[in-house]
UniProtKB/Swiss-Prot annotation:
Reaction(s) catalysed (UniProt annotation): L-aspartate + H(+) = beta-alanine + CO2
Pathways per UniProt: Cofactor biosynthesis; (R)-pantothenate biosynthesis; beta-alanine from L-aspartate: step 1/1
Species whose genome carries this gene: Xanthomonas euvesicatoria pv. vesicatoria (strain 85-10) (Xanthomonas campestris pv. vesicatoria)
The protein's name: Aspartate 1-decarboxylase
Quaternary state and interactors: Heterooctamer of four alpha and four beta subunits.
Residues that bear Pyruvic acid (Ser): 25
Top EC class for this record: lyase
Gene responsible for this protein: panD
GO biological processes: alanine biosynthetic process; pantothenate biosynthetic process
Positions bound to substrate: 57, 73-75
Subcellular compartments: Cytoplasm
Keywords: Autocatalytic cleavage, Cytoplasm, Decarboxylase, Lyase, Pantothenate biosynthesis, Pyruvate, Schiff base, Zymogen
Necessary cofactors: pyruvate
GO terms of molecular function: aspartate 1-decarboxylase activity
């Protein structure tokens, strides 16, 4: 049996551009792609914290250090500049692989620069 587990996450990034007439995708600062291990053209899920929209697209590289988070094409209709989003990628793996797998979790500041990273999410308490 194979499981689908969270591979990588960019947490609470700020949308910098919304380009309806650009070829569809999300352009992500290259430093964030490197930190997460998300590959160019990999499917990603976008969860808009601001408006609740959830959709999928694919990642393309934006200039390193630019802070760009640009939703393009049809995806641009789901967000507005300034919205907070979570970008997530998943990987399929065996149960044995899943036992030791740790996701790459990247947390960013208001300018989409890396504030810190982690490989686990704290247990939620009541």
């Amino acid at each position: 049996m194979h499981l689908s587990l969270l591979k990588a996450k960019i947490h609470r990034a700020t949308v910098t551009h919304s380009e309806l007439n650009y070829e569809g995708s999300i352009a992500i600062d290259g430093l964030l792609l490197e930190a997460t291990g998300i590959r160019e053209f990999e499917q990603v899920h976008i969860w808009d914290v601001t408006n609740g929209a959830r959709f999928s697209t694919y990642a393309i590289r934006a200039e390193e250090g630019s802070g760009i988070m640009s939703l393009n094409g049809g995806a641009a209709r789901h967000v507005q500049v300034g919205d907070l989003i979570i970008v997530a990628a998943f990987a399929s793996m065996s149960e044995d692989e899943a036992k030791t797998f740790k996701p790459n979790l990247v947390y960013v500041n208001a300018h989409n620069a890396i504030s810190h990273t982690n490989h686990s999410i704290p247990t939620q308490a009541a």
